[in-house]
Amino acid sequence: MANIKSQKKRVLTNEKSRLANKAFKSEIKTAIKKALNAKSNDEANKTELVNHAVSLVDKGLKKGIFKDNKAAREKSRLMSA
């Protein structure tokens, strides 16, 4: 553990951020799996799931959870499915 007061605060802040990012990544992974596994005969539902997953990926990019190329790759995979 750090001895400097500000560093002790950063350790706590980093842990909170790590847990929040982990939860958000899990939510995105679930949305992507649902979109990729959606039945092609229900086109309206599949489109809705893909749009939701793309939206979450964009939010992850905006928050700095994903890098540019990963977000682009995930969106490309979703759109082509």
Curated annotation (Swiss-Prot):
Keywords from the named record: Ribonucleoprotein, Ribosomal protein, RNA-binding, rRNA-binding
GO biological process: translation
Keyword rRNA-binding in record: yes
Superkingdom assignment: Bacteria
Assigned GO CC terms: cytosol; small ribosomal subunit
Summary of the function given for this chain in its UniProt record: Binds directly to 16S ribosomal RNA.
Protein name as catalogued: Small ribosomal subunit protein bS20
Source organism per UniProt: Mycoplasma capricolum subsp. capricolum (strain California kid / ATCC 27343 / NCTC 10154)
